[in-house]
Amino acid sequence: MKTDTPSLETPQAARLRRRQLIRQLLERDKTPLAILFMAAVVGTLVGLAAVAFDKGVAWLQNQRMGALVHTADNYPLLLTVAFLCSAVLAMFGYFLVRKYAPEAGGSGIPEIEGALEDQRPVRWWRVLPVKFFGGLGTLGGGMVLGREGPTVQIGGNIGRMVLDVFRLKGDEARHTLLATGAAAGLAAAFNAPLAGILFIIEEMRPQFRYTLISIKAVFIGVIMSTIMYRIFNHEVALIDVGKLSDAPLNTLWLYLILGIIFGIFGPIFNKWVLGMQDLLHRVHGGNITKWVLMGGAIGGLCGLLGFVAPATSGGGFNLIPIATAGNFSMGMLVFIFVARVITTLLCFSSGAPGGIFAPMLALGTVLGTAFGMVAVELFPQYHLEAGTFAIAGMGALLAASIRAPLTGIILVLEMTDNYQLILPMIITGLGATLLAQFTGGKPLYSAILARTLAKQEAEQLARSKAASASENT
């Protein structure tokens, strides 16, 4: 009978297989792992930068208000100091932008979208200091701007900086870290990690490349930036409006009407922003002196309003809980809404370094509160609470303007910790977005990016013509 004998090649084959596995592991592309590690670095740096920016703005605002205390006995002097303090801070921000990094002006979010499409440069070595300190000047001066624009652009530029410092190669790494930094910036600005993720996936959906690595990187970056924020600011809702009552099912149709109102107003607001940009550009004509002086005048006006009518100035985070609590009359709400529409248009359209998320959240809250007060009077049988309409309206203008309803809904839920209102918020946001799309017009950031690219193309064409003319001569 034939017996099986152990093969002498078996141990050799096993060793050969082990060597091949080790060789394959060593030769495997480490880029995905490196990207994920760098995403954690980007998120950490963005979170620290956002905290520093937030603390810097708060410190400047406190110093500015403290300077007014010393002139409280002399009203004319008080108004003069209020104007000058804000004007000087604003002029500082405008000057930095115009002189050293024009792409740091405005929100900065369209710049990141353009960079993701390979249509706008990312010069982090000059944008980072200009956006940071310029934003400190404009927001610290009390202008009607949000901090999310600076933190998103700072975040995207930090992503590119990390890419360059660690010399990662490839389009995937560049694109992923840029998007990761932007998402981390929004998350740290509002203590809203899920909104930061949705912002990239929804608002930047035409530019964002959906790959397994990019999604993981965005998650990691957002987690790290939020951890950094909460280490210094604790785990609390950014806006404390208390726990509001849920909306009964038989009242949900009212939230659809509210969404329709925002769906009409959103595209109109976008047109006003673009029209104000054209108007203010005609005022300064590209001249740096005129532009800085114009910015100083707008900043000084916001400083005066911050003293005379505080609800009409600043980003709006202090206004939201007061309006939601029903502490304003209908007439006062109308005044605040009209005044803040004007100041928002002036500040944002002038090219000041600052965002428009926070001002739009405040406008949505005021309009939602006014609608809620009317509904309470017209339908007493429903036992309505005006504050629920304020929360629903907070993200509706954002949804109608930038066409990102999910981002607006989740952002407000994370900021206010009122998750029981998710259904009326979905109805309001969906109604606003659908009607805004039906009425036409581009989302705000897309329209601003299109203008920037058209201007860039015109400048490149002018330079090429000038170069051709010089060669011919």
UniProtKB/Swiss-Prot annotation:
Chain ranges inside the bilayer that never cross it: 109-116, 177-189, 193-201, 387-401, 402-404, 405-416, 417-421
Keywords for this protein: Antiport, Cell inner membrane, Cell membrane, Chloride, Ion transport, Membrane, Transmembrane, Transmembrane helix, Transport
Q: Which GO terms describe its molecular function?
A: antiporter activity; voltage-gated chloride channel activity
Topology class, membrane: Multi-pass membrane protein
Instruction: Give the residue interval(s) assigned to the motif Selectivity filter part_1.
Output: 106-110
Q: What is its main location?
A: membrane
Q: Which parts of the sequence are marked as the site Mediates proton transfer from the protein to the inner aqueous phase? A: E203
Q: Which residues lie on this side of the membrane: Periplasmic?
A: 70-76, 233-252, 310-329, 377-386
Q: Hey, where's the site called Mediates proton transfer from the outer aqueous phase to the interior of the protein on this chain?
A: E148
Question: Is Chaperone tagged as a keyword?
Answer: no
Q: Where in the cell is it found?
A: Cell inner membrane
Reaction catalysis annotation? 2 chloride(in) + H(+)(out) = 2 chloride(out) + H(+)(in)
The residues exposed to the Cytoplasmic compartment are: 1-32, 117-123, 167-176, 202-214, 282-287, 439-473
Q: Write out the transmembrane intervals.
A: 33-69, 77-100, 124-141, 148-166, 215-232, 253-281, 288-309, 330-349, 355-376, 422-438
Please provide one cellular component term from the Gene Ontology annotations of this protein: plasma membrane
| Position of sequence motif Selectivity filter part_3 | 355-359
HAMAP family, alphabetically? CLC_ClcA
Query: What does it do?
Result: Proton-coupled chloride transporter. Functions as antiport system and exchanges two chloride ions for 1 proton. Probably acts as an electrical shunt for an outwardly-directed proton pump that is linked to amino acid decarboxylation, as part of the extreme acid resistance (XAR) response.
PANTHER family noted in UniProt: CHLORIDE CHANNEL PROTEIN
State the oligomer form and interacting partners: Homodimer.
Give the similarity note. Belongs to the chloride channel (TC 2.A.49) family. ClcA subfamily.
Task: Specify the protein name.
Answer: H(+)/Cl(-) exchange transporter ClcA
Q: Which organism is it from?
A: Escherichia coli O157:H7
Q: Which gene encodes it?
A: clcA
